[in-house]
Amino acid sequence: MKKLFITLTAIVAMAFCANAQVNIQEQYDFNREHLTTTLEMFKADNWGSTFFFTDIYHPLQYSMPMGYYTEIARSLNFWQDTKLGALSAHAEWNGGQLANRAWLFGAEYFLHSQDFRYRLTLEVLYKTIVDNDQDVPMQFTIVWGCDDIFGVKGLAFSGFADFWWEKWTWGVKENGDPDVTNVVFISEPQIWYNIGQFFNCPNLNIGGEVEFAYNFAGAWRPVFGDNKELTIAPACGLKWNF
């Protein structure tokens, strides 16, 4: 964890120097009964954009963090002023203590309203997972963001949905064969309200997220058990925009 902290500190320092969009979130997960610290950064440039986030999990019954998960992605687009400006190449790495490392490569398409209040990104990616057999080495991703929804200043709705192929072994069937699933789905819609606007602290937001997951509970068996079906995990907390 010390190496992770040093790495995150260096990344945040570089992000501030580059005038990137950075935020930190602290949320309480009601089902898993732990706190999750999330650090996010997004930076657009003349050649595309860079995005990363890191989740650090803090079980309340232990003094040390339980684990972490990280994603870092680079969108490459040096043809932004052409008719294909909405289409970018995409490269990504993700992994952590609770998930196998994976490399992803593919394309993304960015849609937005004229004032950029509403944004949607569609991704089609080749995905290879370390030490895992996949029937189809692909992932489909949707990312969205909406500002001032319903005409309410400071109310934002954002999130993502991922669908990919990955083999999970959940135990043994009655006939003795391994109980294996082949596809995974996860979505985490978030809603945040800029409560700080009322007392001269526009960085502060209150809100949370709900995680919808199918065949994704393997890392959380103490909570969900051998549940291969849809699991729902609500969380709430605070977000600080730097």
Regions found by a protein language model. Give the residues of each.
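Cleavable N-terminal export/targeting peptides
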Residues: 1-21
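Short glycine/proline- and aromatic-enriched beta-strand/turn motifs that initiate or cap beta-hairpins
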Residues: 20-62
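Short loop/turn motifs that connect adjacent beta-strands in outer-membrane beta-barrel proteins
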Residues: 21, 47-49, 77-89, 112-120, ...
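Transmembrane beta-strands of outer-membrane beta-barrel pores
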Residues: 26-32, 56-60, 91-97, 111, ...
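Membrane-embedded beta-strands of outer-membrane beta-barrel proteins
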Residues: 39, 72-74, 78, 105-107, ...
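Outer-membrane beta-barrel transmembrane domain signature
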Residues: 129-219, 240-242
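Outer-membrane beta-barrel "beta-signal"
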Residues: 230-242
